[in-house]
A protein has these predicted regions:
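Glycine-rich, Arg-bearing micro-motifs that act as flexible, cationic patches
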Residues: 109-128
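A short acidic, glycine-rich active-site loop
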Residues: 54-66
């Protein structure tokens, strides 16, 4: 049983949490903290950033935070301690950085079977998190 669980999710993709959330609950010790993480991709280095209005990334982070709060209210009302977090940047790095900052005992992350050539060659976000994590990672398919 774990006391501080980090669950990275993508609100636009229910498969990122539909199976992982019950698993995160299942490995939680009584009174555990469940931390939900959403990530806004870094657009600063991308060519598209020059076409976006000023403050677009900040607005995206605020919108994501509001969505995560709604998600937590709908799905975690019975959890004693839950918090939502928004990170910014490359997904695997943001997950690992947040886990370090929180001192998470475990990362519970959804993965999907590789379904395209890029995923097979480069690897999924879950694969990168597993490779570089300094704490247990529970991958849910």
């Amino acid at each position: 049983m774990f006391h501080k669980i980090l669950l990275p999710i993508d609100l636009d993709h229910p498969e990122s949490w539909e199976k992982a959330l019950p698993i995160a609950r299942g490995v939680s010790a009584p009174g555990a903290e469940l931390h939900i993480l959403g990530i806004v991709h870094d657009l600063g280095a991308a060519m598209i950033a020059s076409f976006l209005p000023d403050g677009a990334e900040q607005k995206a982070m605020e919108k994501l935070k509001a969505g995560l709060v709604d998600f937590a209210n709908a799905n975690l009302a019975d959890v004693a301690t839950s918090e939502v977090h928004v990170a910014h940047g490359h997904v695997p790095e943001a997950i690992l950085r947040t886990a370090d900052t929180l001192g998470a005992d475990v990362i519970v992350i959804a993965s999907h079977p590789p379904d395209d050539l890029t995923t097979r060659l480069v690897g999924s976000n879950a694969d990168k998190v597993v490779r570089h994590a300094t704490r247990p990672v529970l991958v849910v398919r």
